[in-house]
Amino acid sequence: MPAFLGLKCLGKLCSSEKSKVTSSERTSARGSNRKRLIVEDRRVSGTSFTAHRRATITHLLYLCPKDYCPRGRVCNSVDPFVAHPQDPHHPSEKPVIHCHKCGEPCKGEVLRVQTKHFHIKCFTCKVCGCDLAQGGFFIKNGEYLCTLDYQRMYGTRCHGCGEFVEGEVVTALGKTYHPNCFACTICKRPFPPGDRVTFNGRDCLCQLCAQPMSSSPKETTFSSNCAGCGRDIKNGQALLALDKQWHLGCFKCKSCGKVLTGEYISKDGAPYCEKDYQGLFGVKCEACHQFITGKVLEAGDKHYHPSCARCSRCNQMFTEGEEMYLQGSTVWHPDCKQSTKTEEKLRPTRTSSESIYSRPGSSIPGSPGHTIYAKVDNEILDYKDLAAIPKVKAIYDIERPDLITYEPFYTSGYDDKQERQSLGESPRTLSPTPSAEGYQDVRDRMIHRSTSQGSINSPVYSRHSYTPTTSRSPQHFHRPGNEPSSGRNSPLPYRPDSRPLTPTYAQAPKHFHVPDQGINIYRKPPIYKQHAALAAQSKSSEDIIKFSKFPAAQAPDPSETPKIETDHWPGPPSFAVVGPDMKRRSSGREEDDEELLRRRQLQEEQLMKLNSGLGQLILKEEMEKESRERSSLLASRYDSPINSASHIPSSKTASLPGYGRNGLHRPVSTDFAQYNSYGDVSGGVRDYQTLPDGHMPAMRMDRGVSMPNMLEPKIFPYEMLMVTNRGRNKILREVDRTRLERHLAPEVFREIFGMSIQEFDRLPLWRRNDMKKKAKLF
């Protein structure tokens, strides 16, 4: 039986899908059929290569050992020509092929690139190391690169689509295109090879699209006629402006007729000089009132130069895109507004744009001693003019003088305490029997205080309820003294220990009568007559009250020297005990004064560097703190011992109970929340501390705080209330700019904020403002 050879003896089969047969040869011998194929893939050098594989594939259908004897193992040939059968009489010789990369002999399949041979595993990319036998590759500087690395390092992108260019390319004006990407700008059709391309400086046009451009109407604008006078421009220079030609003397301002030789401003195709343009169409700066040229900063309906838009608090310019607050004609930084708000909360009094002024008027009996004027928006109006203001405006926007009580606000300062002590206030009993001279002095001082509300530093009081119940009742007051009393007597209440209660500043009598001195400008209080019997009974009651305030119910002799003349009571201490302490205090006080002076100068130097309201606020607090410490050092053992302080002159006079101008305490309502000028919810009554003399200061309401608006806010759609930055959003006059959310319907409010209005009011201020900013209602 004939023996057949295995494939291992004849060679390996290898082929490529993209291979093509370049030559074939058939050899027939006694029933045998042999095919020899040379598989080779050739491409133009310089383009993308596919690995050149060349192998001799021998397909042996049937071999007869008598006709053909194998001479050895058939291997892949690297010769570009077909290897013919070896001569059986000569031994076969194979050339040794070495790999170009590793230098080892090549066995089995070999890749040939041009004249170099590689193992399949050795033919890889120089950069990423990927296999190049299965895909295309590029040769650059003797190195073999894959497509991605070559394009990334040395590739050229198409100017039209941005992709890498391979194969055929089109180069025009130094730019490279794909053939399909180099197209007409107007009709988008690719340019045919050899076609003429028109480039007008921006676009590439084909012949069809470039023909209308040559005969466009623009060429008529550059005619030889002057656009000003209409005559031909012959010899001489022509001025080209506004796409027209002009004589040099015909290019004039449309408004003033001045010949324009330098800069000009065009409006609707007509030239203007800068002066006339600003006068006709210019925009003025709200700060410097000069016309704005160039960049303009717009805030609401107001316009500013970038250098003129400064914060009214810190005087710093606003940068582009910075947030600002607009209040009236002033602009604020958000941080400066917060510091101003804090400073106003710390002030004991607050001034407002709406205040009451007092001017000297007539002093005729029965007429007011001062004429009341109201200041509204920097304009002083007489009360007759105020009557012509609409009712709503009069109630909510200005103060009504007939509802204002001119009650001074007493602080706990050291000067006020000395003044009260000098007026004869008793530390233990407020109202000892006064003398006529002392009472007149007290009365003059109190009237001076109550009538000095129009001064610059005087406190200004707020609006309050315009239906007080106490202001319409007859006013009665019991005034002890040597003068005959007028009006109905009002006995003072007694404590359980039979001691009389004396009114303090916070507990003034509800009914009293003061003789008319022109204080009340609207009505004259009635005068009540007193019968002789009632007068005698009243005199007896007054004596009981008067003498009950002295030891043994006996008034001391005015000529008698007080027994106690020292700060220490009930008896003077020994000098041996208090002497060293007094010396140490006197010596230490001088050192403390020097130290305080040095610290104060250092603080002023540091704080003056902070050119802001916050720095001034800190300086003011430090100075007030030092003054309080200094007053505490000067204070005696007891706040105000009667007839014991040697440096305070003794006096037998006593002051009247504290009262305001018309004698009524301001009615304060605590049943409602109040809103300050920033829209914050605050308590109805300010918390007051007890004064050093044990009395409560007169309660008052802050300036600018009134009863809540009883009118229901109008409801507007959310789109009308929304604040945007793209365009000018004019908010209606009926809308409160600081409380835009109040004009939303309850269901819309809940849909936007996810809560009710009452729940929203209970949130802190920063949280409410943040939610309003997100909803574009801030």
From Swiss-Prot:
Reported tissue expression: Detected in liver, heart, skeletal muscle, brain and retina, where it is concentrated in the inner segment and in the outer plexiform layers.
Name by which UniProt lists this protein: Actin-binding LIM protein 1
Keyword Mitochondrion annotated: no
Keywords: Actin-binding, Coiled coil, Cytoplasm, Cytoskeleton, Isopeptide bond, LIM domain, Metal-binding, Phosphoprotein, Repeat, Ubl conjugation, Zinc
Modified residues (Phosphotyrosine): 373, 396, 439
Principal location class: cytoplasm
Domain HP: 710-778
Domain LIM zinc-binding: 97-156, 156-216, 224-283, 283-343
GO molecular function: actin binding; actin filament binding; metal ion binding
SUPFAM superfamilies, per the entry: Glucocorticoid receptor-like (DNA-binding domain) (SSF57716), VHP, Villin headpiece domain (SSF47050)
Record note on quaternary structure: Binds F-actin. Interacts with ABRA.
UniProt organism field: Homo sapiens (Human)
Gene3D superfamilies from the UniProt entry: Cysteine Rich Protein, Villin headpiece domain
Residues recorded with modification Phosphothreonine: 433
Gene Ontology CC terms, in alphabetical order: actin cytoskeleton; cytoplasm; lamellipodium; postsynaptic density; stress fiber
SMART domains: LIM, VHP
GO annotation (BP), single: animal organ morphogenesis
Function, as annotated: May act as scaffold protein. May play a role in the development of the retina. Has been suggested to play a role in axon guidance.
Region (Disordered): 339-370, 414-510, 552-597
InterPro entries (UniProt xref): AbLIM_anchor, Actin-binding_LIM, Villin_headpiece, Villin_headpiece_dom_sf, Znf_LIM
UniProt feature, compositional bias: Low complexity: 360-369
